[in-house]
């Protein structure tokens, strides 16, 4: 039942959503891709304008970073390193030089994580890192539900000169 899964809480005469539990659900990439897509595309266009030709870029496995790819195709001689499986396909389709981190796959996120991903990231020093997360807490901390993805993201940030969080209005 939804109550046993912690998604609903019974009340007198009905049930209410457990908001905390909803924040812990891994929403599949294909669904996240549809959420706020117009806003993500606008953000992606602006973010891609920051990138110069011949840059080395880290993109995380977020849908927000994924939406940057068509706009990055307008740049010359980029190298993009990503842990995003769907991003690798889109980068290839747009003739952008790309490197996949490899590693263990999180199926719902279509993301590579783990030590193999870390080792690949450590071999590069990127000009830019573009990433997203589940939200921002009241005290300004980035929140997400996937510790393995957080770890990969942290490694990307550590090896980047500049980092930009791609954030839709619902995450603030």
Spans of features found by a protein language model:
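Short beta-strand element of Class I
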Residues: 78-81, 98
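HTH-adjacent hinge/linker in prokaryotic transcriptional regulators
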Residues: 3-58, 69-75, 89-96
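Short glycine/serine/threonine-rich phosphate/pyrophosphate-binding segments
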Residues: 65-68, 172
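Conserved phosphate- and dinucleotide-binding cores of soluble alpha/beta proteins
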Residues: 3, 10, 88-172
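Alpha-helix/helix-capping structural signal
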Residues: 63, 85-86
